[in-house]
Amino acid sequence: MKMTDFNTQQANNLSEHVSKKEAEMAEVLAKIVRDKYQWVAERKASQHLSTFQSDLLPSDRSFYDALSGDKTVFITECKKASPSKGLIRNDFDLDYIASVYNNYADAISVLTDEKYFQGSFDFLPQVRRQVKQPVLCKDFMVDTYQVYLARHYGADAVLLMLSVLNDEEYKALEEAAHSLNMGILTEVSNEEELHRAVQLGARVIGINNRNLRDLTTDLNRTKALAPTIRKLAPNATVISESGIYTHQQVRDLAEYADGFLIGSSLMAEDNLELAVRKVTLGENKVCGLTHPDDAAKAYQAGAVFGGLIFVEKSKRAVDFESARLTMSGAPLNYVGVFQNHDVDYVASIVTSLGLKAVQLHGLEDQEYVNQLKTELPVGVEIWKAYGVADTKPSLLADNIDRHLLDAQVGTQTGGTGHVFDWSLIGDPSQIMLAGGLSPENAQQAAKLGCLGLDLNSGVESAPGKKDSQKLQAAFHAIRNY
Protein backbone atom coordinates (compact mmCIF):
# COMPACT_ATOMS: atom_id res chain seq x y z
CA MET A 1 0.00 0.00 0.00
CA LYS A 2 1.29 3.47 -0.88
CA MET A 3 1.84 5.94 1.97
CA THR A 4 -0.70 8.30 0.41
CA ASP A 5 -3.27 5.48 0.34
CA PHE A 6 -2.48 4.71 3.99
CA ASN A 7 -2.91 8.37 4.99
CA THR A 8 -6.17 8.54 3.07
CA GLN A 9 -7.40 5.41 4.84
CA GLN A 10 -6.37 6.90 8.20
CA ALA A 11 -8.25 10.09 7.40
CA ASN A 12 -11.33 8.15 6.37
CA ASN A 13 -11.20 6.08 9.55
CA LEU A 14 -10.81 9.24 11.66
CA SER A 15 -13.67 10.91 9.80
CA GLU A 16 -15.88 7.89 10.40
CA HIS A 17 -14.88 7.88 14.08
CA VAL A 18 -15.65 11.59 14.48
CA SER A 19 -18.93 11.28 12.60
CA LYS A 20 -19.90 8.31 14.75
CA LYS A 21 -19.01 10.21 17.94
CA GLU A 22 -20.95 13.28 16.82
CA ALA A 23 -23.92 11.10 15.98
CA GLU A 24 -23.69 9.47 19.40
CA MET A 25 -23.54 12.86 21.15
CA ALA A 26 -26.41 14.20 19.05
CA GLU A 27 -28.36 11.15 20.11
CA VAL A 28 -27.45 11.87 23.75
CA LEU A 29 -28.93 15.37 23.43
CA ALA A 30 -31.98 13.98 21.66
CA LYS A 31 -32.41 11.41 24.43
CA ILE A 32 -32.11 14.08 27.11
CA VAL A 33 -34.88 16.05 25.40
CA ARG A 34 -37.07 12.95 24.99
CA ASP A 35 -36.58 12.15 28.65
CA LYS A 36 -37.46 15.72 29.52
CA TYR A 37 -40.81 15.50 27.73
CA GLN A 38 -41.49 12.32 29.72
CA TRP A 39 -40.46 14.07 32.96
CA VAL A 40 -42.78 16.99 32.22
CA ALA A 41 -45.70 14.66 31.60
CA GLU A 42 -45.08 12.85 34.88
CA ARG A 43 -44.58 16.09 36.84
CA LYS A 44 -47.78 17.58 35.42
CA ALA A 45 -49.64 14.54 36.70
CA SER A 46 -48.15 14.74 40.19
CA GLN A 47 -48.09 18.55 40.50
CA HIS A 48 -50.74 19.93 38.19
CA LEU A 49 -50.39 23.51 36.99
CA SER A 50 -53.80 24.38 38.41
CA THR A 51 -52.52 23.69 41.92
CA PHE A 52 -50.11 26.64 41.87
CA GLN A 53 -50.52 28.87 38.79
CA SER A 54 -53.01 31.25 40.40
CA ASP A 55 -50.60 31.87 43.28
CA LEU A 56 -47.65 32.87 41.10
CA LEU A 57 -46.29 36.37 41.63
CA PRO A 58 -44.01 38.29 39.26
CA SER A 59 -40.31 38.18 40.01
CA ASP A 60 -39.00 41.17 41.96
CA ARG A 61 -35.36 40.58 40.97
CA SER A 62 -34.63 41.73 37.45
CA PHE A 63 -32.30 39.38 35.59
CA TYR A 64 -31.86 41.94 32.82
CA ASP A 65 -30.99 44.78 35.20
CA ALA A 66 -28.54 42.59 37.10
CA LEU A 67 -26.57 41.95 33.91
CA SER A 68 -26.56 45.55 32.70
CA GLY A 69 -23.91 48.15 33.46
CA ASP A 70 -20.31 48.75 32.48
CA LYS A 71 -18.51 46.01 34.43
CA THR A 72 -18.04 42.42 33.32
CA VAL A 73 -20.74 40.30 34.98
CA PHE A 74 -20.65 36.77 36.34
CA ILE A 75 -23.36 34.14 36.54
CA THR A 76 -22.01 31.51 38.91
CA GLU A 77 -23.57 28.09 38.88
CA CYS A 78 -24.71 25.45 41.36
CA LYS A 79 -24.02 22.19 39.56
CA LYS A 80 -23.53 18.80 41.19
CA ALA A 81 -22.94 16.69 38.06
CA SER A 82 -23.07 16.77 34.27
CA PRO A 83 -23.27 14.27 31.40
CA SER A 84 -19.75 15.16 30.24
CA LYS A 85 -18.01 15.10 33.64
CA GLY A 86 -20.17 12.86 35.80
CA LEU A 87 -20.13 13.79 39.50
CA ILE A 88 -18.41 17.16 39.87
CA ARG A 89 -18.97 18.07 43.51
CA ASN A 90 -19.48 15.29 46.00
CA ASP A 91 -20.01 17.60 48.99
CA PHE A 92 -22.82 19.57 47.39
CA ASP A 93 -23.58 21.92 50.29
CA LEU A 94 -25.96 24.45 48.76
CA ASP A 95 -25.94 26.68 51.83
CA TYR A 96 -22.15 27.03 51.62
CA ILE A 97 -22.20 27.49 47.84
CA ALA A 98 -24.88 30.18 48.03
CA SER A 99 -23.06 32.02 50.83
CA VAL A 100 -19.94 32.27 48.65
CA TYR A 101 -21.72 33.22 45.44
CA ASN A 102 -23.69 35.91 47.26
CA ASN A 103 -20.47 37.92 47.63
CA TYR A 104 -19.36 37.80 44.00
CA ALA A 105 -22.09 36.89 41.51
CA ASP A 106 -24.40 39.15 39.52
CA ALA A 107 -26.82 36.26 39.03
CA ILE A 108 -26.83 32.65 40.21
CA SER A 109 -27.64 29.65 38.03
CA VAL A 110 -29.16 26.52 39.56
CA LEU A 111 -29.29 23.20 37.71
CA THR A 112 -32.68 21.57 38.21
CA ASP A 113 -32.48 18.62 35.81
CA GLU A 114 -32.58 15.47 37.94
CA LYS A 115 -31.56 12.61 35.66
CA TYR A 116 -28.44 14.03 34.02
CA PHE A 117 -27.30 16.79 36.42
CA GLN A 118 -28.54 15.48 39.79
CA GLY A 119 -30.43 18.73 40.20
CA SER A 120 -33.79 19.55 41.74
CA PHE A 121 -36.36 22.32 41.69
CA ASP A 122 -36.10 22.24 45.48
CA PHE A 123 -32.63 23.76 45.09
CA LEU A 124 -34.13 27.02 43.79
CA PRO A 125 -35.78 28.29 47.01
CA GLN A 126 -32.87 27.01 49.11
CA VAL A 127 -30.48 29.18 47.13
CA ARG A 128 -32.77 32.17 46.61
CA ARG A 129 -33.53 32.79 50.26
CA GLN A 130 -29.81 33.15 51.00
CA VAL A 131 -28.80 35.47 48.18
CA LYS A 132 -29.68 38.92 46.90
CA GLN A 133 -29.18 38.17 43.20
CA PRO A 134 -31.72 36.91 40.66
CA VAL A 135 -31.71 33.12 40.37
CA LEU A 136 -31.66 31.40 36.98
CA CYS A 137 -33.35 28.04 36.55
CA LYS A 138 -31.11 26.04 34.22
CA ASP A 139 -32.84 23.08 32.67
CA PHE A 140 -33.89 21.70 29.30
CA MET A 141 -37.01 23.82 28.90
CA VAL A 142 -39.49 22.30 26.43
CA ASP A 143 -42.88 23.26 27.89
CA THR A 144 -44.40 26.40 29.38
CA TYR A 145 -45.26 24.29 32.42
CA GLN A 146 -41.56 24.28 33.33
CA VAL A 147 -41.44 28.07 33.27
CA TYR A 148 -44.38 28.32 35.64
CA LEU A 149 -42.88 25.60 37.83
CA ALA A 150 -39.57 27.44 37.94
CA ARG A 151 -41.31 30.61 39.10
CA HIS A 152 -43.32 28.63 41.64
CA TYR A 153 -40.02 27.51 43.17
CA GLY A 154 -38.60 31.05 43.11
CA ALA A 155 -36.65 31.35 39.86
CA ASP A 156 -36.24 34.84 38.43
CA ALA A 157 -35.05 33.69 35.00
CA VAL A 158 -34.90 30.60 32.80
CA LEU A 159 -32.52 29.19 30.21
CA LEU A 160 -33.95 28.65 26.72
CA MET A 161 -31.75 26.64 24.35
CA LEU A 162 -32.19 27.22 20.64
CA SER A 163 -30.58 23.83 20.02
CA VAL A 164 -33.67 22.34 21.67
CA LEU A 165 -36.49 24.75 20.76
CA ASN A 166 -37.91 25.92 17.45
CA ASP A 167 -39.00 29.54 17.11
CA GLU A 168 -42.65 28.87 17.88
CA GLU A 169 -41.77 26.94 21.03
CA TYR A 170 -39.32 29.64 22.09
CA LYS A 171 -41.95 32.39 21.72
CA ALA A 172 -44.42 30.47 23.86
CA LEU A 173 -41.91 29.98 26.65
CA GLU A 174 -40.71 33.58 26.33
CA GLU A 175 -44.27 34.88 26.70
CA ALA A 176 -44.79 32.77 29.81
CA ALA A 177 -41.55 33.99 31.36
CA HIS A 178 -42.05 37.67 30.61
CA SER A 179 -45.63 37.51 31.91
CA LEU A 180 -44.07 36.82 35.31
CA ASN A 181 -41.29 39.41 34.92
CA MET A 182 -38.77 36.60 34.52
CA GLY A 183 -35.65 37.05 32.45
CA ILE A 184 -34.40 34.73 29.73
CA LEU A 185 -30.90 33.54 28.93
CA THR A 186 -31.12 32.52 25.27
CA GLU A 187 -28.40 29.99 24.48
CA VAL A 188 -26.81 29.62 21.05
CA SER A 189 -23.97 27.39 19.90
CA ASN A 190 -23.59 28.22 16.21
CA GLU A 191 -24.16 30.89 13.57
CA GLU A 192 -27.63 29.70 12.63
CA GLU A 193 -28.88 29.78 16.23
CA LEU A 194 -27.25 33.19 16.69
CA HIS A 195 -29.29 34.66 13.83
CA ARG A 196 -32.43 33.08 15.23
CA ALA A 197 -31.73 34.63 18.64
CA VAL A 198 -31.36 38.05 17.06
CA GLN A 199 -34.57 37.64 15.06
CA LEU A 200 -36.39 36.53 18.20
CA GLY A 201 -35.26 39.69 19.99
CA ALA A 202 -33.27 37.93 22.72
CA ARG A 203 -31.98 40.42 25.29
CA VAL A 204 -29.35 38.16 26.85
CA ILE A 205 -27.58 35.78 24.48
CA GLY A 206 -25.37 33.05 25.89
CA ILE A 207 -22.72 31.62 23.59
CA ASN A 208 -22.12 28.01 24.58
CA ASN A 209 -18.46 27.21 23.95
CA ARG A 210 -19.28 23.52 24.27
CA ASN A 211 -20.02 21.58 21.11
CA LEU A 212 -23.20 19.74 22.02
CA ARG A 213 -22.39 17.09 19.41
CA ASP A 214 -19.03 15.97 20.80
CA LEU A 215 -18.91 17.80 24.19
CA THR A 216 -15.57 19.50 23.45
CA THR A 217 -15.11 23.16 24.37
CA ASP A 218 -13.57 25.90 22.25
CA LEU A 219 -13.37 29.42 23.68
CA ASN A 220 -12.79 30.75 20.18
CA ARG A 221 -16.50 30.20 19.58
CA THR A 222 -17.18 33.29 21.70
CA LYS A 223 -14.63 35.24 19.68
CA ALA A 224 -16.20 34.02 16.43
CA LEU A 225 -19.86 34.66 17.24
CA ALA A 226 -19.83 37.69 19.55
CA PRO A 227 -18.89 40.27 16.86
CA THR A 228 -21.95 39.28 14.82
CA ILE A 229 -24.19 39.77 17.84
CA ARG A 230 -22.59 43.18 18.46
CA LYS A 231 -23.33 44.14 14.87
CA LEU A 232 -26.88 42.81 14.58
CA ALA A 233 -28.08 43.31 18.17
CA PRO A 234 -25.87 46.00 19.75
CA ASN A 235 -28.08 46.28 22.84
CA ALA A 236 -28.02 42.57 23.65
CA THR A 237 -25.96 41.31 26.58
CA VAL A 238 -23.47 38.64 25.51
CA ILE A 239 -22.58 35.87 27.97
CA SER A 240 -19.78 33.37 27.34
CA GLU A 241 -20.65 29.91 28.70
CA SER A 242 -18.59 26.73 29.31
CA GLY A 243 -14.87 26.10 29.44
CA ILE A 244 -13.92 29.11 31.59
CA TYR A 245 -11.31 28.09 34.16
CA THR A 246 -8.92 31.01 34.69
CA HIS A 247 -8.91 34.76 35.11
CA GLN A 248 -6.58 35.01 32.14
CA GLN A 249 -9.27 33.40 29.98
CA VAL A 250 -11.79 35.88 31.37
CA ARG A 251 -9.52 38.80 30.50
CA ASP A 252 -8.92 37.41 27.02
CA LEU A 253 -12.65 37.11 26.31
CA ALA A 254 -13.83 40.24 28.15
CA GLU A 255 -13.54 42.39 25.03
CA TYR A 256 -15.96 40.04 23.25
CA ALA A 257 -18.44 39.16 26.01
CA ASP A 258 -20.25 41.23 28.62
CA GLY A 259 -20.07 38.43 31.13
CA PHE A 260 -19.52 34.78 31.89
CA LEU A 261 -21.47 31.79 33.13
CA ILE A 262 -19.12 29.59 35.13
CA GLY A 263 -20.06 26.33 36.81
CA SER A 264 -18.00 23.16 36.45
CA SER A 265 -14.61 24.76 37.06
CA LEU A 266 -15.82 26.31 40.32
CA MET A 267 -17.73 23.26 41.51
CA ALA A 268 -14.63 21.10 41.10
CA GLU A 269 -12.68 23.17 43.66
CA ASP A 270 -12.83 22.29 47.36
CA ASN A 271 -12.18 25.89 48.41
CA LEU A 272 -14.97 27.61 46.51
CA GLU A 273 -14.26 31.02 48.05
CA LEU A 274 -10.72 31.16 46.67
CA ALA A 275 -11.82 29.55 43.39
CA VAL A 276 -14.28 32.37 42.72
CA ARG A 277 -11.65 34.97 43.60
CA LYS A 278 -9.14 33.37 41.25
CA VAL A 279 -11.44 33.48 38.24
CA THR A 280 -13.02 36.90 38.88
CA LEU A 281 -10.05 38.83 40.31
CA GLY A 282 -6.95 36.79 39.52
CA GLU A 283 -4.56 34.99 41.87
CA ASN A 284 -3.46 38.07 43.75
CA LYS A 285 -1.15 38.19 46.77
CA VAL A 286 -0.72 40.66 49.58
CA CYS A 287 2.84 40.35 50.83
CA GLY A 288 4.59 41.49 53.99
CA LEU A 289 1.85 40.39 56.40
CA THR A 290 2.97 40.69 60.02
CA HIS A 291 -0.24 40.58 62.04
CA PRO A 292 -3.48 38.56 61.99
CA ASP A 293 -5.51 41.75 61.51
CA ASP A 294 -3.59 42.49 58.33
CA ALA A 295 -4.19 38.96 57.06
CA ALA A 296 -7.89 39.50 57.68
CA LYS A 297 -7.84 42.82 55.80
CA ALA A 298 -6.13 41.19 52.81
CA TYR A 299 -8.61 38.32 52.79
CA GLN A 300 -11.63 40.61 53.10
CA ALA A 301 -10.38 42.71 50.19
CA GLY A 302 -10.11 39.71 47.86
CA ALA A 303 -6.59 38.28 48.08
CA VAL A 304 -5.88 34.62 47.39
CA PHE A 305 -2.31 34.53 48.70
CA GLY A 306 -0.70 36.06 51.79
CA GLY A 307 3.05 36.62 51.91
CA LEU A 308 5.17 35.98 55.02
CA ILE A 309 8.73 37.31 54.78
CA PHE A 310 11.36 35.24 56.60
CA VAL A 311 14.22 37.61 55.71
CA GLU A 312 15.62 39.26 58.85
CA LYS A 313 16.72 42.49 57.20
CA SER A 314 13.22 43.16 55.87
CA LYS A 315 11.07 45.79 57.58
CA ARG A 316 8.28 43.22 57.39
CA ALA A 317 10.18 40.20 58.69
CA VAL A 318 8.42 37.51 60.71
CA ASP A 319 9.74 34.54 62.66
CA PHE A 320 8.03 31.20 63.06
CA GLU A 321 5.75 32.21 65.94
CA SER A 322 4.70 35.57 64.51
CA ALA A 323 4.05 33.88 61.16
CA ARG A 324 1.86 31.27 62.83
CA LEU A 325 -0.05 33.98 64.66
CA THR A 326 -0.48 36.02 61.47
CA MET A 327 -1.86 32.97 59.64
CA SER A 328 -4.57 32.61 62.27
CA GLY A 329 -6.11 35.85 61.01
CA ALA A 330 -7.49 34.53 57.71
CA PRO A 331 -7.64 31.35 55.55
CA LEU A 332 -5.39 32.64 52.77
CA ASN A 333 -2.97 30.46 50.82
CA TYR A 334 0.27 31.47 52.53
CA VAL A 335 3.59 31.94 50.74
CA GLY A 336 6.90 31.99 52.60
CA VAL A 337 9.45 34.46 51.25
CA PHE A 338 13.06 33.36 51.70
CA GLN A 339 16.44 34.70 50.58
CA ASN A 340 19.51 32.49 50.31
CA HIS A 341 18.37 30.31 53.21
CA ASP A 342 19.51 26.76 53.80
CA VAL A 343 17.25 24.27 52.01
CA ASP A 344 16.56 22.31 55.19
CA TYR A 345 15.47 25.48 57.00
CA VAL A 346 13.06 26.43 54.22
CA ALA A 347 11.58 22.93 54.08
CA SER A 348 11.18 22.86 57.86
CA ILE A 349 9.29 26.17 57.98
CA VAL A 350 7.06 25.19 55.06
CA THR A 351 6.19 21.82 56.57
CA SER A 352 5.60 23.12 60.09
CA LEU A 353 3.36 26.00 59.01
CA GLY A 354 1.64 24.24 56.11
CA LEU A 355 2.63 26.90 53.58
CA LYS A 356 1.30 26.58 50.03
CA ALA A 357 4.34 28.02 48.27
CA VAL A 358 7.93 29.14 48.66
CA GLN A 359 9.09 32.42 47.10
CA LEU A 360 12.84 32.62 46.57
CA HIS A 361 14.12 36.20 46.62
CA GLY A 362 17.87 35.71 46.54
CA LEU A 363 20.60 34.18 44.39
CA GLU A 364 19.07 30.71 44.39
CA ASP A 365 20.10 28.87 41.21
CA GLN A 366 18.68 25.87 39.38
CA GLU A 367 20.66 23.41 41.50
CA TYR A 368 19.23 24.96 44.69
CA VAL A 369 15.70 24.84 43.28
CA ASN A 370 16.04 21.20 42.25
CA GLN A 371 17.27 20.23 45.70
CA LEU A 372 14.52 22.21 47.42
CA LYS A 373 11.90 20.50 45.27
CA THR A 374 12.91 17.12 46.67
CA GLU A 375 12.65 18.39 50.26
CA LEU A 376 9.25 20.10 50.06
CA PRO A 377 5.92 18.36 50.69
CA VAL A 378 4.08 17.27 47.55
CA GLY A 379 2.01 20.08 46.06
CA VAL A 380 3.98 23.00 47.51
CA GLU A 381 4.83 25.44 44.73
CA ILE A 382 8.17 27.15 44.15
CA TRP A 383 8.11 30.77 42.99
CA LYS A 384 11.29 32.52 41.88
CA ALA A 385 11.61 36.29 42.18
CA TYR A 386 13.73 38.32 39.78
CA GLY A 387 14.77 41.95 40.00
CA VAL A 388 14.02 43.96 36.86
CA ALA A 389 15.97 47.13 36.14
CA ASP A 390 16.14 47.87 32.43
CA THR A 391 16.33 44.39 30.87
CA LYS A 392 14.24 41.25 31.20
CA PRO A 393 15.98 38.69 33.44
CA SER A 394 16.72 35.13 32.39
CA LEU A 395 14.15 32.86 34.00
CA LEU A 396 15.02 29.50 35.53
CA ALA A 397 13.75 26.64 33.42
CA ASP A 398 12.85 23.76 35.74
CA ASN A 399 10.74 23.15 38.86
CA ILE A 400 9.47 26.75 38.97
CA ASP A 401 5.70 27.11 39.22
CA ARG A 402 5.62 30.91 38.98
CA HIS A 403 8.09 33.64 38.14
CA LEU A 404 7.72 36.85 40.14
CA LEU A 405 9.03 40.02 38.53
CA ASP A 406 9.81 42.89 40.90
CA ALA A 407 11.47 46.27 40.51
CA GLN A 408 15.19 46.38 41.21
CA VAL A 409 16.69 49.61 42.55
CA GLY A 410 20.45 49.38 42.88
CA THR A 411 21.05 46.03 44.51
CA GLN A 412 17.66 45.90 46.24
CA THR A 413 14.79 43.84 44.84
CA GLY A 414 11.43 43.96 46.56
CA GLY A 415 9.96 46.47 48.98
CA THR A 416 11.27 49.40 46.94
CA GLY A 417 7.89 50.87 46.06
CA HIS A 418 9.13 51.37 42.49
CA VAL A 419 7.53 50.23 39.23
CA PHE A 420 9.61 48.69 36.45
CA ASP A 421 8.96 48.89 32.70
CA TRP A 422 6.08 46.44 32.18
CA SER A 423 6.91 46.06 28.49
CA LEU A 424 9.77 43.81 29.69
CA ILE A 425 7.34 41.18 31.04
CA GLY A 426 7.01 39.21 27.80
CA ASP A 427 4.72 36.17 28.12
CA PRO A 428 2.63 36.88 31.25
CA SER A 429 1.09 33.41 31.59
CA GLN A 430 3.32 32.26 34.49
CA ILE A 431 4.17 35.70 35.89
CA MET A 432 3.30 37.26 39.24
CA LEU A 433 3.75 41.02 38.96
CA ALA A 434 5.23 43.02 41.85
CA GLY A 435 6.85 46.40 42.35
CA GLY A 436 5.12 49.63 43.31
CA LEU A 437 1.57 48.35 42.86
CA SER A 438 -1.11 50.53 44.42
CA PRO A 439 -4.77 51.50 44.05
CA GLU A 440 -3.67 54.03 41.43
CA ASN A 441 -2.11 51.54 39.01
CA ALA A 442 -3.72 48.21 39.96
CA GLN A 443 -6.36 48.40 37.22
CA GLN A 444 -3.75 49.01 34.54
CA ALA A 445 -1.51 46.27 35.93
CA ALA A 446 -4.35 43.75 35.99
CA LYS A 447 -4.93 44.26 32.26
CA LEU A 448 -1.49 42.81 31.47
CA GLY A 449 -2.72 39.23 31.80
CA CYS A 450 -0.37 38.04 34.55
CA LEU A 451 -1.38 35.23 36.90
CA GLY A 452 -1.75 37.77 39.66
CA LEU A 453 -0.52 40.95 41.28
CA ASP A 454 1.72 41.07 44.36
CA LEU A 455 0.75 44.03 46.53
CA ASN A 456 2.81 45.28 49.44
CA SER A 457 4.00 48.81 50.24
CA GLY A 458 1.36 50.42 48.03
CA VAL A 459 -1.41 49.20 50.35
CA GLU A 460 0.26 50.17 53.63
CA SER A 461 -0.01 53.07 56.05
CA ALA A 462 3.48 52.20 57.38
CA PRO A 463 5.94 49.37 56.68
CA GLY A 464 4.28 46.12 57.75
CA LYS A 465 0.95 47.82 58.52
CA LYS A 466 -1.71 47.18 55.88
CA ASP A 467 -4.30 49.87 55.20
CA SER A 468 -7.83 48.52 54.83
CA GLN A 469 -9.03 51.39 52.63
CA LYS A 470 -6.06 51.09 50.27
CA LEU A 471 -6.56 47.34 50.02
CA GLN A 472 -10.24 47.72 49.23
CA ALA A 473 -9.48 50.41 46.67
CA ALA A 474 -6.81 48.28 44.98
CA PHE A 475 -9.06 45.24 44.64
CA HIS A 476 -11.96 47.41 43.50
CA ALA A 477 -9.68 48.70 40.74
CA ILE A 478 -8.68 45.15 39.80
CA ARG A 479 -12.35 44.14 39.52
CA ASN A 480 -13.19 47.17 37.39
CA TYR A 481 -13.10 45.61 33.91
UniProtKB/Swiss-Prot annotation:
Region (N-(5'-phosphoribosyl)anthranilate isomerase): 284-481
Gene: trpC
One MF term in the entry's GO annotations: phosphoribosylanthranilate isomerase activity
Record keywords: Amino-acid biosynthesis, Aromatic amino acid biosynthesis, Decarboxylase, Isomerase, Lyase, Multifunctional enzyme, Tryptophan biosynthesis
Protein name per the record: Tryptophan biosynthesis protein TrpCF
NCBIfam families assigned: PRK00278.2-4, PRK09427.1
Coiled coil feature spans: none
Gene source species: Vibrio parahaemolyticus serotype O3:K6 (strain RIMD 2210633)
EC numbers, comma separated: 4.1.1.48, 5.3.1.24
PROSITE patterns documented for this protein: IGPS (PS00614)
Region listing for Indole-3-glycerol phosphate synthase, in residue ranges: 1-283
HAMAP family for the chain: IGPS_B, PRAI
SUPFAM superfamilies in UniProt: Ribulose-phoshate binding barrel
Top-rank lineage group of the source organism: Bacteria
Chemical reaction(s) catalysed: N-(5-phospho-beta-D-ribosyl)anthranilate = 1-(2-carboxyphenylamino)-1-deoxy-D-ribulose 5-phosphate; 1-(2-carboxyphenylamino)-1-deoxy-D-ribulose 5-phosphate + H(+) = (1S,2R)-1-C-(indol-3-yl)glycerol 3-phosphate + CO2 + H2O
